[in-house]
């Protein structure tokens, strides 16, 4: 299986090579080595890793320095990127549901996405979710609003939702009050490309499938 992981990562690296400058490609090779190390430590899986790599390509091309599975204040972020004094975090969402949540997949995924936004968005200037074209994320509308427009009722709903699945440690009211999702990357793995969506535009389309 290790060889298959390497083959798949190298396939993506080769596929994007022609789109990159020499310096950008050098940065991608460093990230490749990082992913292989993480795989040997059993910390990553291939579906997630190829999406991280494609997101990294997009960020490297726009001038960011990128780290994968970056430890930040006791939490591990999928992608942490810096450019000048600016920083951003990207969390990759594949839509995977573990067997333990076979009977509540929608609520579980909604809580997972909500928890990511509330926990991570405070640690960078910009917080982004990355997902695939075939998975429609269930994002609470209250997290799309500017924080100052979030009501106490909405804050309490988010708190209850997150605590139902993620209570170690629980998200704080302050984290919920200040959380913000800035944009969404839709990752086309087949073509190793990304389309960046404005959050309200994505939510408008996702509303057709919202349950």
Locate predicted features.
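A structural signal for short, well-ordered beta-strand segments and their strand-loop junctions
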Residues: 67-68, 89-91, 128-131
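Non-catalytic C-terminal interaction segments of nucleic acid-processing enzymes
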Residues: 1-29, 134-211
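Active-site beta-strand-loop-beta-strand hairpin of nuclease catalytic cores
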Residues: 77-98
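Acidic-basic catalytic patches of nuclease active cores, encompassing PD-(D/E)XK
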Residues: 2, 7, 14-70
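Well-ordered, non-membrane alpha-helical segments in soluble/globular domains
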Residues: 50, 106-116, 155, 164-167
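Amphipathic coiled-coil/heptad-repeat helices and related helical stalk/stem segments
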Residues: 73-75, 112-113
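Accessory terminal regions of nucleic-acid processing enzymes
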Residues: 44-46, 77, 205-211
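Catalytic cores of nucleic-acid endonucleases
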Residues: 94-151
